[in-house]
Amino acid sequence: MMEAKPKRRIVTENGDTGEDLVLATLIGNGDDVGPLVRHAFEMGRPEPLVHQLKNVARKKEAEIEDLCKTHYEEFIVAVDELRGVLVDAEELKSDLASDNFRLQEVGSALLVKLEELLESYAVKKNVTEAIKMSKICVQALELCVKCNSYISEGQFYHALKTMDLIEKSYLKLIPLKVLKLVIERRIPVIKTHIEKKVCSQFNEWLVHIRSSSKNIGQTAIGLTASARQREEEMLERQRRAEEQNTGGLGELAYTLDVEDSEQDSVLKFDLTPLYRAYHIHTILGVPERFRDYYYENRLLQLQSDLQITYTQPFVESYQTFLAQVAGYFIVEDRVIRTAGDFLLADQVETMWETAISKIVAILENQFARMDSPTHLLLVKDYVTLLGTTLRQYGYEVGPVLDALDKSRDKYHELLLEECRKQIVTAITEDTYQQMVIKKEADYENNVLSFNLQTSDIMPAFTYIAPFSSMVPDVCRIIRSYIKGSVDYLSYGVNTNFFSVLRKYLDKILIDVLNEVILETISNNSIGVSQAMQIAANISFLEKASDYFLRHAAQLCGIPSRSVERPQASLAAKVVLKTSRDAAYLALLNVVNTKLDEFMKLTENVNWTTEEMPQGPHEYINEVVIYLETVMSTAQQILPMDALYKVGVGAIEHISNSIVSTFLSDSIKRFNANAVSAINHDLRVIENFADERYHSSGLNEIYKEGSFRSYLVEARQLINLLSSSQPENFMNPVIRERNYNTLDYKKVATICEKFKDSADGIFGSLANRNTKLTAKKKSMDMLKKRLKEFN
């Protein structure tokens, strides 16, 4: 065996230099000596290096020689062994040659069989490949047949999925170029056919959904109307509860709320054709084209829906028009909520803005044409239902409500004009007779319902009301006006519209009712009973104005206690009070005119009679009878303050008439007998005034202003003319006590006309009467002093 290689030893011979040792070490370690050689040549001193290399070579040769001497026996053994190996190799070679020959003989036959087998394998492979190709073709053709079947059955989604499978999984594998080419050419054609077919079905759906939009809109608006009715009923119950509980929660706000789920469950319409068409176009890779197609066609439909015909009155077509628009946008809302990203919100917003501007323009135009408040209200109600319905779907309906608000004044003008005609009819056809109520139901309808009762106790029937039938008739008209106004103002821009309603209520009471009453009052043909009944009616209408305000507050959902404060009353109440005073004045004018007809002092009195009168004139009885009739009637229907005004006015007019007659130019002179006769007449009137003042109960109310006190001027004048010392008039103390109402100039004028009978034909006989002479002197003195005073 070979021994292990001994470690390398470096022998240092005598004479070796340090450089030789370094070089020897580098070579022994197998290091690269190239840099050392290069350095030596670069320095121009290669000889020392060559010398060193030779020394190293000699050392190596010496080492080899020593190695051979040490292992020569081992070398010999190795050579012998190598010779034995060569002999064995020759024998092995001979055996291999023999075996190879025999193998060649046997393998020739097997090789022929192998070639046949390989040929069979090749045939099998070709057949297998052919079968595989055939299967691919058959499968592709079967898919084509299935695709055709789907198309014929209208199952376009499955047809497209089948074509997609053919394209992705089979088309590249089809070995037959002809078949592959045919399929490649037919696929686009089939896709185009499917797209056209789907578009055709979608167009049919567009026509159908447009024709269905009216029913959809009507159903949705009907649901909103039902919800509004339920809401109003709930508010009414809430209002009654609040009225009964004065410690309630105050004013509450309510909003109409209709659940979308309820509407969605009722509003059933099929969007499947739309979904299918969009899905198929998405599979075809052209979803954007279909979205544009849908948007353009729906926009055209909307523009067509927004066209109204002028051959049919708008009041007959507005529901169809508005329901069609409502249905259109309900469909669009369902599409945008259920079809994913098919429809953009901006597109729907554009369509809505188009619709809203057109609707507003149509409404403003049609409202301007309307001349019936009923028609305008019908349209307004339906428009607010439309707004409430579409607001639930997120549409901004403010502009539509603004259009309604702009027509508010137009509606109320029409309503006022309609109510004016009704009020004129009610007042014109009034009999001005106290209303006779025979049944409790009539009492409730005509009195209690308007708070016109004068007592909280139910009267006995038959009941004679202090007002005529005009009052409840007018109250019903005003109540219907309030209802009509509330109906228009409800569900509009302003939820708190009571202040607006209050303004319109004042308007009808002042500009319509009050004007008609004043026109009636100014009519010269009215009689005393008419004027008196009108005054009484105004008093009750003034009282009813509080009911009107409470009723308006009730309809607005405002607690009645908030309008029961004095400062909350209507301005019309003050105006009606003024008109009531005008009615009293008209009544007094009629009474005074009639009194003038009865009295006619210049005709009924002999101002220069020579006979001493024994009693009052006959005309004074007619005056008293007339006054009795007037006061009795007034006491039945007029309030106490009005009764007092009528009595005072009539009595004062009689007093003024007496004084005016003495001042009249038609009376040139009068004597003491005439004064005595007038004195008798005046006493009758004074007695009547006292009796009526006390019997009517006015003495308990007006303690310091009796009827007699309004005859004081006439009484003081008669007393002065009857006085034995008339010159005392010029005495300030006496005048202040007895004649304080008489005017100097009037007294002077009247006294100038006073001619005692002593100045007559038989005056010489009268001179014998000392009293008459003294009175005459006193009168002459008064005349003189009055002239001086004047």
UniProtKB/Swiss-Prot annotation:
Protein name: Exocyst complex component SEC15A
UniProt keyword annotations, A-Z: Coiled coil, Cytoplasm, Exocytosis, Transport
Coiled coil: 49-70
GO CC, alphabetical: cytosol; exocyst
One Pfam family in the UniProt entry: Sec15_C
Keyword Ribonucleoprotein in record: no
Subcellular location: Cytoplasm, Cytosol
Keyword Repeat carried by entry: no
InterPro entries, sorted: EXOC6/Sec15, EXOC6/Sec15_C, EXOC6/Sec15_C_dom1, EXOC6_Sec15_N, EXOC6PINT-1/Sec15/Tip20_C_dom2
A GO BP annotation: pollen germination
Gene giving rise to this polypeptide: SEC15A
Superkingdom, natural source: Eukaryota
Null allele phenotype: Male gametophytic lethal due to defect in pollen germination and pollen tube growth.
Subunit description: The exocyst complex is composed of SEC3, SEC5, SEC6, SEC8, SEC10, EXO70A1 and EXO84B.
Role according to the record: Component of the exocyst complex involved in the docking of exocytic vesicles with fusion sites on the plasma membrane during regulated or polarized secretion. Involved in polarized cell growth and organ morphogenesis. During cytokinesis, involved in cell plate initiation, cell plate maturation and formation of new primary cell wall.
Family, per entry: Belongs to the SEC15 family.
